[in-house]
């Protein structure tokens, strides 16, 4: 059935699967002891999360196109031994140099969702010529790794410098969608291989996961610059 399918193939718990299916058909699962106000807030939160997902997916597609348009970034990935096919499988992209590149992707660069999603940084204490707070892209001149939840939705990014620079890896900040200490990079693609193999390899970085997958080790995941937490372990059970 549909619930069993989501539990097996999306790694959801029974309750998560029920809520997900209900949301897809416009129903709301009653919460024990939840007031109407709490239910309304929960509905608004789900809507906000869906909107943020849309913003991040749009950015992911733009970064993928920018990778194809950047010989330097393509050469870097080839130098790391990665094929075009594996880059496509993982949705790798490139964030070009420039402080406001995403303004070409999102015409309304002042949209608050760009900050809430972690794509753009805003400095309230610095004002531009228009009197508004200064904004600029968080990720610049980096290989981009979309981070997806167990449903395959983009919830954030990891960006790696091409040359020397610090930090080598830059993650999305904490957002309504993304919590670094809870997520595992690559789990969305690795979940079936983990189940079939009966084991999982936990590595340090995004690039390790992609490289291992290219060489047939498809049951690898990476923590996002943190040690393995109880939340990570729970996702793998």
Segments and roles (model prediction):
Residues 1-112, 116-121, 125-130, 142, ...:
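Non-catalytic accessory segments of DNA primases and related replication-initiation nucleases
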Residues 132, 136, 217:
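Acidic, divalent-metal-binding catalytic cores of TOPRIM
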Residues 135-140, 197:
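Short loop/turn motifs at secondary-structure junctions and domain boundaries
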Residues 142-148:
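A short, hydrophobic, proline-anchored segment that marks a local hinge/packing element in signaling
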Residues 148-151, 165:
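Short acidic-glycine loop/turn motifs at beta-strand connectors
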Residues 162-178:
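A short, polar/charged loop-to-alpha-helix boundary motif
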